[in-house]
Amino acid sequence: MTHTALPVATVVFGPEAAVATGHALVLAPVTPSWDEGAFFAPVIEVLAGAGLRVTVADTLSLWDETVDSMAVFTARWRELLPGFGPVDLLCGNALGGAVAQALLPEAGPATAALLVSGPTRTDALLEARLGEIADLAASGRPGEALALLNRRVLPSGSASERDAGPTPDADEAAGRRLAAGMRLLRGIDLSPAVLGHPGPLLQLVGERSQLVTRRHTAAAPHHEVHVVPGTGMRPHFEQAAHVSALIRAFLREKGLQ
């Protein structure tokens, strides 16, 4: 595991560039602090196992108080993208998935995309649920915000959702990240970037997700959206074997293994 010198928190997994079969760039979801790729561990294992060099980036590293929209935020990522070098597979989870979709026009026509619970567009219900988390975080209650987020990422109606544990610890910095990340997703519609992408794309969403669902995605005829049975926002953990098999098949089909 290595780190890059880019002005964003990153960690790199997999073989050295000289022997890798390709390069995957993974953009992180909203997390209370940078977890160095733990959020995507099962997928990283699959990608690295297929011979890809995997760079995982903390998406919110490029956020500050002057960023007030997804357009401004993705403009920053657009400027940074060339610094990662050639990207064969652009990946993103949740907020990172949204940013990855916004970057598709800059990624190149042959670049493959792998998205997990990455919204292409929002609607009133999704924005209300994200806004509730953001408002708690912004009002000095980051622990409550994180507890609500932890419930919302679970499958709807699950026992663990009904029997939530104690409010987790979260400091002011975590609250700023939570509020910023949730609010960046307000009013987005990245459909033109997705529908216009000529490369392959696989989007995975949970059948019982309380947040990002099939209706929040877009896909061209040559793309694939797969709804993972029984899962919430983290199908790659909840149905790891099933999701890993889908990703391996996608990599083989697209010549990335």
Regions of interest found by a model, annotated:
Residues T231-S244:
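Catalytic histidine-centered segment of alpha/beta-hydrolase-like enzymes
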Residues C91-A100:
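Gly/Ala-rich beta-loop-alpha elbow adjacent to hydrolase catalytic centers
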Residues T2-T66:
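Conserved HGGG/HGGXW glycine-rich cap/lid loop of the alpha/beta-hydrolase fold
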Residues A48, M70-D88:
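Conserved acidic catalytic loop of the alpha/beta-hydrolase fold
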Residues P105-G140, R177-A180:
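Flexible "cap/lid" loop of the alpha/beta hydrolase fold
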Residues A124-L126, P142-A193:
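Conserved alpha/beta-hydrolase catalytic His-Asp/Glu region
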Residues V205-G206, Q210-H216:
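Conserved alpha/beta-hydrolase "acid-adjacent" motif
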Residues G196-H197, Q203-V205:
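Short beta-strand/loop motif that positions the catalytic acidic residue
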